[in-house]
Amino acid sequence: MAPPKFSITPEKEASRSQWIHRQLIAKTPPVAKDVNLSGQTAIVTGSNTGLGLETARQLLYLGLSKLILAVRSEEKGKAAREELLADKEAGSGEIEVWNLDLESYDSVIQFADRAKALDRLDIAILNAGLFQAKETFIASTGYERCVQVNYLSSVLLMTLLLGALKSKNETRPGRLVLVSSDTAAWANFKEQKSRPILATFKNKADKWDMQERYGVSKLLGQFYLTELAKRVPASVVTIDAANPSFCYGTALTRDGDGTIAGLLLNGFRRVVGKPTAVGALSIVHAAVSFGEEVHGQYAEDGEIRPMAPIIYKPEAEEIGKQLWDETLAELSFARLEESIQELTS
């Protein structure tokens, strides 16, 4: 697709020099003072620590009435809940802890079914993800773990949550945010030439590159979000991606703790990384700022910015359609196409 009018080109946005500028110099403005989430309900996945926890905290600061912490470990989720309840600035919003395991399709479906039973759902932020130091596979699906969690299970959840997000309040549609990454723009994505595409992620890599695979998993999400936004009107659910930037104080790279690569990465993070509170603010902007103009777009530092350059290349249309068809076929048990059609009927 042709890029909308941005303040920066996709290629410049993806450059390392611009990344350093964003990390060390750029500022994220505060959320507008008139934003009030009183009466609203939000889900934040991966919210027991790091960016997810800080995002949840900031939503409560904005007056959110009900927060659902979606976590793999209920014990850690309950500890996060207690931390938020003890925060005097977080108000008196209700906080629930729900189990969600993105390595299991059954868990995703059960979570989505539970969400559909809510009286209302205004915001869903899909923040949970992982960064794998070693290549491993999910036995039940055969897919490499990073692609399974960051892409397949995440887009299954985002699509299943659309029905719950379909607003009962005509003044503002529900908002669905997929947390993305700068690394999507840096991915070589050699798998784009394969047909089918997804099946390549069931094969062992010739040489494991954890940043490349993480970036590819986030790029796949950008392709899917772009296709999904074409099929779901912004007036029904507004869908966007958020880039929190490279932050310290997160558990994303915990899989590499104790390794030389992990030590180097954590040291680098302390030099150029942003505090999690700043990264979370970008996510919150994607959830509460903007209007329908953010639909199908990518928000960073309180602005709408370009996604990975490939998203705007001529070949993106064919790649996006191929990936969409393969993804819906892989997730056919969930009847996602029918769910999408029901939203607009």
From Swiss-Prot:
SUPFAM superfamilies listed in its UniProt record: NAD(P)-binding Rossmann-fold domains
Binding site for NADP(+): 51, 76, 101, 127, 214, 218
Alphabetized Pfam families for the sequence: adh_short
Origin organism lineage: Eukaryota, Fungi, Dikarya, Ascomycota, Pezizomycotina
Function: Short chain dehydrogenase; part of the gene cluster that mediates the biosynthesis of virensols and trichoxide, fungal natural products that contain or are derived from a salicylaldehyde core. The pathway begins with the synthesis of the reduced chain in virensol C by the highly reducing polyketide synthase virA via condensation of one acetate and 8 malonate units. VirA has interesting programming rules since the first 2 ketides are fully reduced, the 3 following ketides undergo beta-dehydration, and the last 3 ketides are only reduced to beta-hydroxys to yield the trihydroxy portion.
Entry EC no(s): 1.1.1.-
Active-site annotation: 180, 214, 218
Pathway assignment: Secondary metabolite biosynthesis
Molecular-function GO term, any one: oxidoreductase activity
Record keywords: NADP, Oxidoreductase
Similarity comment text for this entry: Belongs to the short-chain dehydrogenases/reductases (SDR) family.
Descriptive protein name: Short chain dehydrogenase virG
Enzyme class of the recorded protein, top EC level: oxidoreductase
InterPro entries: NAD(P)-bd_dom_sf, SDR_fam
PANTHER family: PHOSPHATIDYLINOSITOL-GLYCAN BIOSYNTHESIS CLASS F PROTEIN (PTHR43157:SF31), PHOSPHATIDYLINOSITOL-GLYCAN BIOSYNTHESIS CLASS F PROTEIN-RELATED (PTHR43157)
